[in-house]
Swiss-Prot record:
UniProt protein name: Aminotransferase ALT4
Additional free-text comment from the UniProt record: Gene clusters encoding host-selective toxins (HSTs) are localized on conditionally dispensable chromosomes (CDCs), also called supernumerary chromosomes, where they are present in multiple copies. The CDCs are not essential for saprophytic growth but controls host-selective pathogenicity.
Biological process according to GO: biosynthetic process
Organism (species): Alternaria alternata
Keyword Transferase appears in the UniProt entry: yes
Amino acid sequence: MSVVRPKKVFQTPIDPGVSLRRKKDFYIWAATIGFAQLWRDIKAFKWYRPLQMADLASHYFYIPLGRLDPRILSSAPNDRMLIKTIPHEMSQDYDETGILGCPGREVVNAGSNNYGGFTRFEYGSASVIKLALRNLPFNPAPEELNTLVEREMADYMEADACATAISGYGANLLAFLTVAETAKLSDRQCIFLLDEESHSSMFVGAFLNKEAKFHRFKHNDIADLEYKLRTMKETSPNALVCVAIEGMYSLAGNVAPIPAILALRKVFNFCLLVDEAHSFMAIGCKGRGSFEWWQARGYECPLSEVDIMTATLSKSVGCTGGLVMANKIYASNLQHQARLQREEGDECLSTIVLFRALTLIRKPLFIERRMKTLEEKARYVAERLDEAGCLLLSPPGSPIICFPVGTVQQASNFVAECLKKGFAVACGVPPATPIWSCRVRVCIFATTSWGDILALVNTLIAVSCKLRIDGVQSMKFDTDSLPKVSIKEDIVSDEGNAADLALQEYVEQLAAKYPAEDCRAIAPLNVAQAREVFEYGVQSFEMYGIGASSVRWFYGTFDVFIRLEQRLAGLYPSLISHSGKCRAMLGSDANVMAVSLLSAVAGPMYAKDVLNLVLVPQNAPCYVKKGATLDKVQPSTRVTLYEDLRDLEVEGTKLQKHRYYHVTLYLETVDEDGSILDLSNRIKDILLTLKNAPSLTGLRLILDDSRGLGKIGPRHLGFLDQMESQHGVSFFSTALGPQLAAITTVVVFGSWFHSLNHQGGYVISSEAFTEAHTVSSKSFVFSTPPMIVQAAMSEKTLELLAGGSGLV
């Protein structure tokens, strides 16, 4: 009896294998990149000395790879945007050279996550944002505004409760914490069962809850999920099992099998956590994600079946921030955990982000039209690419269209070729994908014109043929292939205008109670300086919108970010005197940055015989301690949370077993009571307690200046500003002594929220450390950067505090 093979349409798309020749080409290409970086080091008389195991790959591959074809964006991330063309001879140092003088050109944007096209502000929504920027505190937002957004968002998503978070990354951390605490309250073991292709933030969220167990199941594999659920029911019958999935997966574009998962839920009664980061305002008739996607296909998938749902405002909505929705018992626990975080002084969403959320969800008819338009355009692109023989990993109608290209080299070449033709697309490469499963990632926007959609399809096919992507045949489509009828949005203009007018009136009502120029909100600026910063924010908004809509590593960066990072890098002469050339990096969420920073520096050292001793005070912020203890215990690393110096005496005794050790020390520059760190004596006391100084190979000093910047120093520029005024630019040599200073790496970390009432965080350190950390930091690699508006306002504030000086 012959076997009937299923047709292609019934097969699950998988990444094809990579030929031996292409693997060989990749290794030669990777070696070329590494040797080119080595030659640049030699010409600059530099000898790179890696401090940790991961640093070598960062310096010789990931950093130069990311700078082969850098994208510097100088307009809003709309469907068409302006980018700077960086000459190849200066691309490896693009953030240190005169990028503003480089020529710019307009390209079609198919690389960011602006699926709904909401970076183009509809009707009167831009007026609402500008009014809020000028008349209300930037951050913290009025509490009643935050409460209103949480209530209306819960209603829109048909949830019992909603809590806001500073980032989508932070939203997942809060969601997993809520599940773990719910299990603890019911005296049950918590077990997280995650889809293996879930977001990095979901894995981090699971890892941070140390009392919980953690397992993976194969991507979208219902049989594997059922097997693991049945096993857990037999081995841990009383456990609270949480199945965590994404609604739509960003590096495949496929949607989770929600109907099948809900069927399993009826049998095993597990908690269901769904991350709708890429599907919120991207799929579903009302933009509510994967459940609506399946409802439109005839399945009964009520949103009430979700126990916890996370979403982000950083992607399709075009801002920065996250949302956590919850039902039943998880709703009250979510509100409790969110309240605890606020009481501990956590950041909160800025006023303009909250108003942008309101301007959107109060226009349900407008959203419905956008979602229909988006699916129509996404389906057209997918069908044409499929017709040309492209192996799509995403289903028709998904706004993320992914197809495999094999190696990192092929992915990099594909992106570069598209950019030459005027189209910006993205790619998925390690660590986000397996080494031989790199993908091209094309994002469809509802606002992209049909002419650009057609040109995009033809470009993708042409580049695929040029690079010999398996299965793709040469084809060119014309306007006759386009749908005859497109959806118009003008019929919902009455709804949009009325909603925005009501919100403008609400801004004015709030401004009477919470004026923007309140002394506490604008400190350390005076009223005139604050007005200048507000107007600079308005100008930035008019040019860039609010948010970046995508991750820098996979998409590109904005000239605004580079200017702020350059200013931060030159802010402290004492740090430059000690470290040499400095660099800075930005993040949208200071807490998440702290987790990533401490997790990265707690890794093993490059020298195998050196113990990395990480010392963190017990009174350090919660997220600092969680980051330091995030990863599994390794024999080459020891993390110690100490109350006082007596705890370190025990640690000093243990050090006798090790020939060499390196100390990573976290210190806050200003305590809660306002006392300023005596760095010299603190270091001396700690090293004296360890009693093994001759074996010390190095010191990494992490100075948390969150309570310093904007508060202390003659220019209100923080701890180092204060120390430089007292000890000069040789402060570190004086405080540490020349011998210890020579082996010390200084890292300055801070929160814009606690210092300037802005949003997000920053890191400043030596060029070597900062470059390596742009790869080792999970928050930098996988999280959306800060709001462009906020970065511009922070840069202007630093300029004013520094006395109006230009870039150092």
